[in-house]
Amino acid sequence: MANHKSALKRHKQSLKRAARNRAVRTRIKNVIKDVRIALQQQDKEQAATALVQASAVLDKAASKGVVHWKTAARKISRLTKAVNQVA
C-alpha cells in the first residue's frame, strides 16, 4: 500500500475511475444487447429506438475516454447496418 499522501490520493482516484469506467462499459454491453434482442425478434421499431440509445451511450463513452472513438464508431456502424438490413 502507498505511504505518501499523494500516492494514497492517486490510488483512491484510480479506484473511483475504475468503478465509473466499469459501470459505463456494463451500460454499453446492455444497450448493445437490447439492439441485438430487438433484431432477433425482427422488431424494426424497437431496434431503431434501441439503436438511437446505444449510439448515444457509445458516443458519450468515447468522448469521456472510456472506449476509443474508433471502437465506438465501429460498433455504431455495425449495429446501424444490422438494423437497416431488417425488412
Swiss-Prot record:
One of its GO terms (molecular function) is small ribosomal subunit rRNA binding. Keywords: Ribonucleoprotein, Ribosomal protein, RNA-binding, rRNA-binding. It comes from the Bacteria. InterPro entries: Ribosomal_bS20 (IPR002583), Ribosomal_bS20_sf (IPR036510). One of its GO terms (cellular component) is small ribosomal subunit. Residues 1-22 are annotated as: Disordered. GO terms for biological process: translation. Binds directly to 16S ribosomal RNA. Belongs to the bacterial ribosomal protein bS20 family. This is Small ribosomal subunit protein bS20. It comes from Nitratidesulfovibrio vulgaris (strain ATCC 29579 / DSM 644 / CCUG 34227 / NCIMB 8303 / VKM B-1760 / Hildenborough).
